[in-house]
Amino acid sequence: MKRRLLVLTLLGLSAAAAQAAPITTVVSANGNGGNYGGSLSVLNDGIFPTEASQWNLADKVSWNGKGNRFVFAFGDLYRIDSVRLSVDNNDGYLLEYSTDYSAWASLLTVSSGVGEISWGMDTMATDPSDPEHVSQLAFTPREARYVRIQATDGDNSYSIGEVAFTGERADNGSTNPVPEPAGLALIALGLAGMGLARRRRV
């Protein structure tokens, strides 16, 4: 009985792990804002700048004036379950999503000063279980192939340190999902459970 309970528990944990996962993205610049400082590669490298750090250092993408947009391409249709991002604390930012790179709709609005940092870079998250969760970030999961971010208001000096998405490939995506490590673990545990049950019968 104990073995069966252990197997069922592990199966449940593996099933949860197989669902939501970080979404891999490719970043590009779009818009008419002109020059920006920093490398686009810092926006999706998984590294969040230190909070309250200076807005225009090399580990961020920074610029002056509105017009710049930075696009995150998922490579397939994904359901976005949560967003975690690092931006300059005293500016407003808009994230929009699209399935076709043509029609865009609002995904998330980040208002100036909603985080806990009073100066410099602030990390914020929509996931209530994240230590950086900000309750003022109204977020609804959406299916998208692209997300873009742009500045909307503030002191005209803007900065983004990281934008990370968590979710899973949508059922109607263009390709069949490749089994992830968590999914393979789920299969292995299922087979192990069947083996234990069979051994008890013999």
Show which residues each predicted segment covers.
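Positively charged n-region of N-terminal signal peptides that target proteins for export
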Residues: 1-4, 180, 197-202
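Sec-dependent signal peptide recognition
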Residues: 2-8, 183-186
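Bacterial N-terminal signal peptides
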Residues: 8-14
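Sec/Tat signal peptide C-region and signal peptidase I cleavage site
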Residues: 16-20
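Aromatic, loop-rich ligand-recognition surfaces of beta-strand-rich domains
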Residues: 21, 53-110, 133-177
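Predominantly extracellular/luminal regions of secreted and cell-surface proteins
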Residues: 22-52
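Extracellular carbohydrate recognition and processing domains
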Residues: 108-136
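A short, hydrophobic C-terminal helix/tail in secreted or cell-surface proteins
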Residues: 179-197
